[in-house]
Amino acid sequence: GQGAIVDTDRKTDLALLGNGLFILKKPTSITPTFTRNGSFSLDNSGFLRASNDAYVMGAPLVDGNFGPTPTELDGLLPIQVPLTREDIPMSELKILADGRIEAAYGTEVSYPVSAITLGLFSNNSGLKELGGGSYSQTDKSGLVRLGAPSDTGYASLESGGLEASNVNITDELTAMIKAQQQFNGSARLMQTNSEMVEKLTR
């Protein structure tokens, strides 16, 4: 069922309003997993990753623009946000209700990056639970059907929030402590990539 939405103010935290699951893939794995836990963050290379380090999968751009949603899992790619464009650091990240991700670099102009893709199953109770809120497809669940957020039958996204059932108090505390440490550290250090990413996604 739909959990209440808790505001986190981190742009890469995504809540699903409606049906569907995010699609994740571990770098070392060929089979994707599925989750409703949208507690994501950008790594130092700009990859959008889940709390278990898996890549968040999305629809690749076509000639630099948003293209159609792939129908097969093979058509998805890990979402990667370019942290600089022509040597200018990213100044803003937007994740829209329909899954499209855009980034701006010092000006008002937003560039397409990728689009989050969701999976739907005819029988959710047939999914195999893997722990940590992630699931895998089985014969009982049926094959995944891919769609874009806000498509008919698919959830829309809310950036800057998490579904209450997916908010783990310890995770939230860890994230807050981390942010505090980075803030203290950055007062002394030159700003590194990871701090830049951290700051932008808040």
Task: Explain the meaning of each model-derived region.
Residues 1-61, 68, 74, 81-202:
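Amphipathic alpha-helical polymerization modules
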